[in-house]
Amino acid sequence: MATAPSVWTPPEWNAPEETREELVPLEWRGLRYTCRLVTSDRPPVTEPLLLLGGALQDMYAWPRLERRLSAHMPLVFVDLPGVGTADDLPAEQGFDALAEAALVVTDRLGFDRINLLGASYGAPIAYRAALSRPARVARLVLAGATHRMNPRLVSDCEQVWSARAALADDIDGTLSDSGTHEIAGRAVATLLNTARRDQVSQAATVARLLHRQFARITPAAARRHAVCHRRLLASDPLPAERIDAVRALVFTGEHDDVSTPDENRAVAAAIAESTFLLVRDADHMVHLEREAEYADLILRFLTDLPLDDLPYTTAPERPGARR
């Protein structure tokens, strides 16, 4: 039976009258990449936010969150090596290398301290960045995080994108309509909890959106996605070391079967000053299924507002506190 949507009225979102975008070229160990710095005409209410997204997200992949947060703080989006416009990251390089490349962004922009958001594939990068330079991270947000990915799931993802890279009807790499829809459908099924779709907000809409996105992916991009998923299989995404000096929020959708609630809770338990909660009526794609709530939750945490009694989340837990 479908769950009733959580009753919640989003606050008024007053977009800034003017935003400015700057593309900043970066280089790390000979690899070229770029970040986007988005600022507004309003004074910031918290430290700049650096966003590290999933394997399928480039620096233009967060338009909804960008619109909702740009009035409150500078936003930094980045194509790390292996993503978007950046150079390819050698397959043997892991998440430690990506964390180093992410921290170059803060050095290049001259930020003493930042807020850091790591979502899905970006979570192990953000965790490592906070672990290595905790004094630079004011607050850490991890969405859809796990110490160890389900190897069957990751293998399925890798096979989907390897198949897209290999299957082409002609020299330009295009697929027939049937081939395109088959690959896109398989990709969507790896990210959404189809068994609970009647309990997930906007499940059908999000499935269609992702299907259209995946159907347009080129063989070159598919090869990159396959490499990203091989990286997840090569080693555990998160290190065993605890984070003791950074305040953190760890969350995901209550129906997430990519990084399960228990897996996210275990990540929160490895961070001394962590808060853990779940967003209701959502799965791994919570940023699309409940985008207003996603933005509200992040803004609340980054501006030190209470997270208690929110109608769209479970009660906050503090699993990282040492007994």
Regions picked out by a protein language model, each given a short descriptive name:
Residues 219-266, 278:
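Conserved serine/cysteine hydrolase catalytic core
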Residues 131, 138-174:
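Flexible "cap/lid" loop of the alpha/beta hydrolase fold
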